[in-house]
Swiss-Prot record:
UniProt GO cellular component terms: cytosol; nucleus
Family note: Belongs to the HSBP1 family.
InterPro entries linked to this entry: HS1-bd
Annotated source species: Rattus norvegicus (Rat)
Source taxonomy: Eukaryota, Metazoa, Chordata, Craniata, Vertebrata
Disulfide bonds: none
Keywords recorded for this protein, A-Z: Coiled coil
Gene Ontology annotations of biological process type: cellular heat acclimation
Coiled coil: 12-66
Protein name per the record: Heat shock factor-binding protein 1-like protein 1
Domain of life where this protein originates: Eukaryota
GO molecular function: transcription corepressor activity
Record keyword Lipid metabolism present: no
Pfam families for this protein: HSBP1
Length: 72
């Protein structure tokens, strides 16, 4: 044993526990990130569908041209 680095019996256990905890946190964070990305993509798709439906309704109501003319 080296005199400059004393052995700590519980040091390895503590280090392993800390590494395991960090690994678990990282895995949970990655899962959360994936879930959030999926939900944001789904929300974007729903917004696009809603916009198409609104455009269709406006065209059916005959107000599409009047709104475009008012904004130009």
């Amino acid at each position: 044993m080296d005199a400059r680095t004393p052995e700590v019996p519980c040091g390895d256990l503590l280090q392993n526990a800390a590494e395991n905890l960090l690994q678990e946190v990282e895995e949970h964070f990655q899962a959360l990130t994936a879930t959030l990305n999926l939900r944001m993509e789904e929300m974007g798709n729903r917004i696009e569908d809603l916009q198409r439906n609104v455009d269709d309704l406006m065209a059916q109501a005959g107000i599409e041209n009047s709104i475009k003319e008012a904004t130009t």
